[in-house]
A protein has these predicted regions:
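Helix-loop-helix module between adjacent transmembrane segments
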Residues: 2, 6-16, 49-54, 88-92, ...
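Alpha-helical transmembrane segments and their helix-start/interface "positive-inside/aromatic belt" motifs
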Residues: 1-5, 37-43, 71-92, 137-138, ...
């Protein structure tokens, strides 16, 4: 924790003393990373998707994130609402109308449609779906699932470094492991602080629109961040069970209600037509959208730098924070349920949200009601609602939604940083929550006071660049988790059953020419189907390799005659109830003593 705090203070001092230098350095570094490693970011996003689908479809999908009999900690509705709030949050309100509108006015390079026409509507929505829907959740699900598995099923510390235990013993106590954990804390801190700073700007814009008064200057920013910091620290101190769950459930209701209102009062039939069209075009254009690369030309480079590769890097940089939070709330789920829900439910909700708000924004432009994209675009949502009925009320709902998203993101980040700073402690101590919550609020505030949006953008660029080494960590996480899953008791039991049945079939064919049935006759312990199955044996996978091999079966065949005789002797020694009768070592030939139990008629 000390190292993380020192780095935090150093970066904060940099932002205060030389904000322009921070912004310039971040922009240059981000450009270099995107141009030279854009291919890696795209490849990692696809690899994560394929990996998750594989472990969900294969027998590993039956494995539970916890003990075999563990039950989920939260209802499915609460679980989904917390996933939604942590994984998207402010970005949903911000990018929902703004990104599709931007692509509608300026189509992506691979599109041949004319800008600001009906033909440009669906491609614009689909591009936003690519950036915000399924693929971001693949990275979150990978980190969260591997952490939940390691912590709740393997009993390891819930730290990023602990994920490498399958290949490096005691990884979290090694220098490399500690560096990874400190890096995860810093990425969480600065990444969240940057987003919260942008959220504070949105709240200022919304407050100005709701009150009808222009709110400029640093004073309002100080008030907004100070009040919200106190609120999310109090919420974080109540823990996930109360604070985050309550706010997430409330916000999910507000989001659904707001989307339903816009759908009903907006161009309803137009939006309903866009839903299937957008889904079909998403799959049709998926390869084209994923294939865009900086090396294809200056236009493609500019687009990748501003959108696609930027988003991949940004989601990867957020994965330690969001993944660890998802792990905290996902105990008791099977891997199949975990992957299915995380990939399908947020994707579906995000798709509907982008269709409703992006489609309404585009239709507004087509109908001659322009929506200017001012500054970073925090005005778009409010301007869009201004063309619909009850805009005064809906603006207040949006403002409340942003405030709650602000709090849930900061609350979740504070809990995660506190946990990581205390060696994975499930519930961080109150002082630790206060320390990291205060640091998060202070950094958001001072970055805005020092250089405004430019400083925030510069820090965001640095955090995006910091995601480059984490792409390598993601590759390691996939390898280590796959290795763990291959040695999971569920898989080994299945492998053992397969081997045992295989041996039985071979023997039945050899000895009885196929005229046999499987049974469960009692045999000496040394000859049982699980005779060599040692659940505590660290080389259990090697055991399975041996037991399923031809060589092993051949060796067993040589002893069949001896074993058959032992089985017959054992059966003869059973009493009427099928239990083995104790035999005295002093006189093995002595018959068992008579008991007072009456004979059966």
């Amino acid at each position: 924790m000390v190292v993380a705090l020192i780095v935090t203070l150093a970066v904060l001092a940099w932002a205060i003393i030389a904000p322009d230098n921070l912004a310039e350095t971040g922009t240059n570094l981000q450009s270099w990373v995107v141009v030279n490693f854009g291919w890696l970011f795209t490849s990692i996003m696809l690899a994560c998707l394929i990996f998750l689908l594989a472990i969900a479809i294969l027998p590993t999908g039956k494995i539970r994130l916890g003990a075999d009999d563990s039950a989920p900690d939260f209802s499915r509705a609460s679980w989904i609402s917390m996933l939604f709030a942590a994984g998207l949050g402010i970005a949903l309100v911000f990018y929902g109308p703004m990104e599709p509108l931007t692509h509608f006015l300026t189509p992506p390079p691979y599109e041949t449609v004319e800008a600001a026409t009906q033909d440009a509507v669906v491609p614009a929505i689909v591009q936003g779906m690519l950036h915000q829907a399924t693929l971001p959740w693949t990275v979150y699900a990978l980190v969260g699932g591997s952490l939940a598995y390691a912590a709740y099923r393997r009993g390891r510390l819930p730290l990023i470094s602990s994920l490498f235990e399958p290949v490096v013993t005691n990884a979290n106590n090694r220098i490399a492991g500690k560096i990874i954990d400190v890096f995860a804390v810093l990425v969480t801190l600065f990444g969240t602080a940057t987003s919260l700073g942008i959220g504070a700007l949105q709240i200022r814009t919304g407050t100005s629109i709701v009150t009808g008064r222009p709110l400029e200057g640093n004073g309002i920013i100080v008030v907004i961040i100070s009040v919200l910091t106190v609120l999310f620290i109090i919420s974080a101190m109540t823990g996930i069970q109360k604070g985050i769950r309550m706010m997430s459930n409330l916000n999910l209701g507000l989001v659904i209600g707001l989307a339903g209102f816009v759908l009903i009062t907006g161009p309803t039939l137009y939006l309903l037509d866009l839903v299937p069209a957008s889904i079909m075009q998403f799959f049709d254009r998926f390869i084209d959208m994923m294939s865009i690369a900086p090396s294809q030309g200056p236009v493609e480079e500019e687009f990748a730098l501003a959108w696609t590769i930027l988003f991949w890097a940004w989601w990867i940089s957020w994965s330690p924070f969001v993944g660890m939070f998802i792990a905290k709330i996902s105990r008791g789920r099977t891997i199949r349920e975990y992957v299915a829900v995380i990939l399908l439910v947020p994707t579906s909700l995000t798709t509907v949200w982008f269709v409703i708000f992006g489609g309404t924004a585009a239709k507004s432009e087509l109908d001659g009601n322009p929506i200017p994209i001012e500054g970073s675009g925090e005005n778009v949502m409010f301007d869009l609602l201004g063309y619909l009925p009850l805009s005064g009320f809906t603006n207040i709902v949006v403002l409340i939604t942003i405030v709650i998203f602000f709090n849930t993101a900061a609350d979740s980040a504070t809990n995660v940083m506190g946990s990581m700073s205390q060696s994975g402690r499930p519930v961080p101590s109150t002082p630790m929550v206060i320390i990291w919550g205060s640091a998060l609020g202070a950094i958001s505030l001072f970055l805005l006071l020092a250089g405004g949006e430019d400083t925030l953008s510069g820090l965001q660029s640095i955090m995006v660049s910091a995601s480059l080494p984490f792409t390598i960590i993601l590759i390691g996480i996939m390898y280590c988790w796959a290795k763990d899953l291959a040695r999971d008791p569920v898989i080994l039991r299945q492998n053992f059953a397969t081997a045992a049945i295989d041996q039985g079939v071979r023997r039945g064919l050899d000895e009885h020419n196929g005229n046999f049935i499987f049974g469960a006759d009692p045999v000496p312990q040394s000859q049982g189907a699980g005779a060599e199955f040692e659940k505590d044996d660290p080389n259990l996978s090697e055991w399975y390799t041996e037991v399923a091999s031809e060589e092993y079966l051949s060796e067993q065949a040589k002893e069949r005659d001896k074993q058959e005789k032992e089985r017959e002797t054992f059966k003869e020694s059973l009493d009427a109830d099928g239990h083995a009768q104790p035999v005295s070592e002093a006189d093995e030939s002595a018959p068992p003593e008579q008991t007072d139990t009456p004979e059966k008629n």
